[in-house]
Amino acid sequence: EQAHIMEDHCIHCGQCLEVCPQNAKTFASDMERVKGYLQRGVRTVLSLAPSYLSVLDFDQPGQVVDALMRLGFDEVRETAEGAALVTEEYQKLLKSGQMTNIISTCCPSINDLIEKYYPSLVPMMAPVVSPMIAHGRLIKQMYGPDVKVVFLGPCIAKKAEAVGDERVEGAINAILTFEEVIRWWREEGIRVEECEDKPMGNPDPGVNRLYPIGGGVITSVLTGGSEDHYEKFHAEGIKTCMELLDELTRGEVKGGFFELNVCKGGCVKGPAAERWKRSMLKARLDLEHQVKYTEEAVHIEHEPILLDKVFEDRYIQDDQPTERELTEVLRAMGKYTRQDELNCGACGYATCRAKAEAVYQGKAEISMCLPHAVAQAESMSNLVMDATPNMVLIVDRDMHIRECNKRMLDKLGISREEALERYIFEFIEVEDIEQVLEDKKSILRKRIQLETLDVIAKETIVYIESVDSALVVYQDVSKEEKAREQHMNLKMETIDIAQKV
């Protein structure tokens, strides 16, 4: 079985990619599509997220431009150019003062989170496209609708926004991550530090390069903006953002402009930038070093661009189990009483009942319950031990019985509790066991006679290094030996009779 993303519930935050040790999920790459554009000679412009300033290694920012153009792109322009357009729209909203609260809509994961899980807050969302979409539309206006626009950045949610949201379809043709481009440079033998310092294809976007860090949107909006009456707040990290959204849902805050980022630290710490392992402080300082806070973007003359976006209620109403259905799931998890509900949190859910509800809704598997899995494993292990016709026990270096199966207990004539307090030498000879524990060499299928148990057996003893003990298995062959003995006696009697005749 494999976990599958429930697209209608997903906010594309990338947490599953970051935390999964098995790398079971990967980012769907557009690399071949982009290479196809370049190989066919299609005019292709790259929209470069300003987070490159804190993620990529270079001596001069222009070296990144040259390295990208060597791959075949016709032009490299900063996404911050689109951010400048978004800043102007935010300033208009603030100046008008018509919205009770304004939530920035630059982060597509935050947009998904609100539309799917906080639909009552949709009216507070700034009705403006993201900087990436604004930039894509600007580039297509400049060069015509046939130009291909490729976005390069650290965010995987941009992919879902560009190709999965019909409201902004067509603005961006492909998405690449920094990791993908670095591999591409390596394949082509391009070393950024050896490249020329080339200028971007766009005018200076000024302070709008700060969008990728926490508070960057607010700083951009305040620079050159007119006075307004909104308090400015910024929050980063999904937990902090959800706490703030909960407060807004309760109506506890009014007259605020809220800049929210799902990624703690902002876009510079996006899921496709984690491999660099830069601290939030270092990433922020690297970017701030390249940006002049007080400079507005150089104005670009262009035809009017559609920057409006209508956000919607996309709330998913999950089926809720009845108390009886919930009880059935809990029983399947091995939770028969309230005392069985350990609420250990190992499955990722706060309580066993929350986990059971998720199982009912198809979001989780019963096997994800760690205590249940351990109990199942122990149950299966005990079943195997008890079902085997052989006598099995584990003995430590002191000859203390550590484990014993039912068949052995029957032969010893004692209970399991009593057996675990006894020594094996009280019942049988232990020379072979001592030898294996001393030499750490196994004995396999040795024929012996356990006189005290009235058993003829084939003995197998294996040393278990992890617990410094011996696994002892006796295969009872008494019946076979007696049958063989009877057959031999019959054979000898037949020979004896024949000789007498």
Predicted regions and their residues:
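Sensory coupling linkers of modular signal transduction proteins
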Residues: 462-501
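Iron-sulfur cluster-binding cysteine motifs and their immediate structural context
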Residues: 1-11, 15-31, 274-276, 346-360, ...
